[in-house]
Amino acid sequence: MLVPTVIEQTARGERAYDIYSRLLKDRIIMLSGEINDQMANSIIAQLLFLDAQDNTKDISLYINSPGGVITSGLAIMDTMNFIKSDVSTIAIGMAASMASILLTSGTKGKRFALPNSTVLIHQPLGGAQGQQTDIQIAANEILKSRKKINEILHETTGQPLEKIQKDTERDNYLTAEEAKEYGLIDEIMANKKK
């Protein structure tokens, strides 16, 4: 992936940054692409760095992701909840699967989506092969993950567990407006040009 460079004028001359480093100076973190251990480590490091720098200022986490590994996503979520800084979450494009959990886990009152964003909630996906006992272990782990994810959705949206269980039985795509009504986000960001 080509990462743009930004040139900034300083008293000492010019300084070149990759765009993500420049955004980090403004307390903006971009979560884009599949959530995996490598991405989680990068996002967690940025959250910890910004919190250590100044824990009285908000951190903005922009999310455009198809989701990914549950344990990686939960590590990001735990860090968001651990740090003192409020974490504002903003869906841009798609916040699907584990990314929707991160979106709704932002600080209450500071969870947003752009007007044309899509949010997808569903049950965890997984597969297993091998001996029957190994398959049973994997199936039990998926059931535990589903219960955990549904409890997070219950806590963050206020929806009854039974409704969440039903609504996540299959892929459930929501518009920004539907995500707001469901309680996944607090507001839809308006067009600043109008």
Curated annotation (Swiss-Prot):
An example GO biological process term is: protein quality control for misfolded or incompletely synthesized proteins
- SUPFAM superfamilies linked to this entry: ClpP/crotonase
Pfam families, sorted: CLP_protease
Q: Which reaction does it catalyse?
A: Hydrolysis of proteins to small peptides in the presence of ATP and magnesium. alpha-casein is the usual test substrate. In the absence of ATP, only oligopeptides shorter than five residues are hydrolyzed (such as succinyl-Leu-Tyr-|-NHMec, and Leu-Tyr-Leu-|-Tyr-Trp, in which cleavage of the -Tyr-|-Leu- and -Tyr-|-Trp bonds also occurs)
The protein's Enzyme Commission number: 3.4.21.92
Q: Which terms are listed as keywords in the entry?
A: Cytoplasm, Hydrolase, Protease, Serine protease
The highest taxon in the source lineage is Bacteria
Top-tier EC class? hydrolase
Task: State the active site.
Answer: S97 (nucleophile), H122
What is the predominant subcellular site recorded for this chain?
A: cytoplasm
Q: Which family does it belong to?
A: Belongs to the peptidase S14 family.
Q: What is this protein's function?
A: Cleaves peptides in various proteins in a process that requires ATP hydrolysis. Has a chymotrypsin-like activity. Plays a major role in the degradation of misfolded proteins.
Complex formation = Fourteen ClpP subunits assemble into 2 heptameric rings which stack back to back to give a disk-like structure with a central cavity, resembling the structure of eukaryotic proteasomes.
**Name of the protein in its database record:** ATP-dependent Clp protease proteolytic subunit
State the organism of origin. Answer: Lactobacillus helveticus (strain DPC 4571)
